[in-house]
From Swiss-Prot:
GO terms for cellular component: plasma membrane. The modification FMN phosphoryl threonine is found at residue 175. The complex is composed of six subunits: RnfA, RnfB, RnfC, RnfD, RnfE and RnfG. Keywords: Cell inner membrane, Cell membrane, Electron transport, Flavoprotein, FMN, Membrane, Phosphoprotein, Translocase, Transmembrane, Transmembrane helix, Transport. The chain crosses the membrane at residues 9-29. Pfam families: FMN_bind. It comes from the Bacteria. It comes from Edwardsiella ictaluri (strain 93-146). Its main location: membrane. It is a single-pass membrane protein. This is Ion-translocating oxidoreductase complex subunit G. It is found in: Cell inner membrane. Belongs to the RnfG family. GO terms for biological process: electron transport chain.
Amino acid sequence: MLTTMRRHGIRLALFAILATALTAIVHQLTTRTIAHQAALQQQRLFDQVIAPDGYDNDLQRSCLLLRDPRLGDSSAHRLYLAQRQGQPIAALVETTAPDGYAGAIRLLVGADFSGKVLGVRVQEQHETPGLGDKIEIRISDWIDSFRNKVVHGAQDPAFRVKKDGGEFDQFTGATITPRAVVNAVRRTTLAIRDIRPHLASLPRCGESK
């Protein structure tokens, strides 16, 4: 009787060990797959903002943290530094337009250190479907109107929607959304321009300072 019970106990213990090991292996493989897919998706987004042949470093491994009120809030924002032959040439910054019609709009803005916008993409928005959501590249190409535009200062009259005397189209029935994005792109581009001499002082992502 005791021998039979011991055998059952050993079998149950072995089964539990095998099940735990299998679960751990599956979890590890799944985690790696998810991380790999997330990295691919992030790189595809980067490629839409800055030309891949314009830099020669790994953007995802060149992440710094930038605090600047021009980025929409007081939190630390990710800055991905593009380099060529070891020299900084541009940056991609995750920024926020806090004054969208339906709340904050999260953007990825790429610019060089002379104030030229390289590209912009929307990362998250909750604007009105059919109106404000035209900032999304899958709906319209409006967001590409920033490409290669130069910001000449905080009061640059061209970097406004046409209703405010600037160069950028607003949407029919939705002026607040494009105005918020234009203003955020202008502010973020200036933040990128101004940070060039201070890059060495920025903490890397994952660090605190």
